[in-house]
Amino acid sequence: MSDLLNKKCAPCKGGIIPFDISQIHKYQKKVDGWDIFKDKNEIFFLNKKFIFDNFSESQKFINNVGKISEDEGHHPDITFGWGYAKIIITTHAIKGLSENDFILAAKIDQIISA
């Protein structure tokens, strides 16, 4: 089990430095299947697509993601439809990735394994 599951997202209002690429790769090893991408503004994001058998399962998963996100005070961008859900996570206040993003990713993965 990832040590990230035992942590809580810390409120972030900016003022901290986003992870550099070596920190990102270190933390990426702690969350399975999450891809890293960088947008046109050079901001890093975590990205993962989850596959389901139908719309109802996708919706149930997204509702659970919403509950965890509210509990953690850290909110991903979510796209979903019939048989899939796509989650994108970043720390908007610092325009990059922080430990919060990986904590949330680990907790989202726990929904699937539960």
Roles of regions detected by a PLM:
Residues M1-S56, K60-A114:
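Long, contiguous binding/interaction regions
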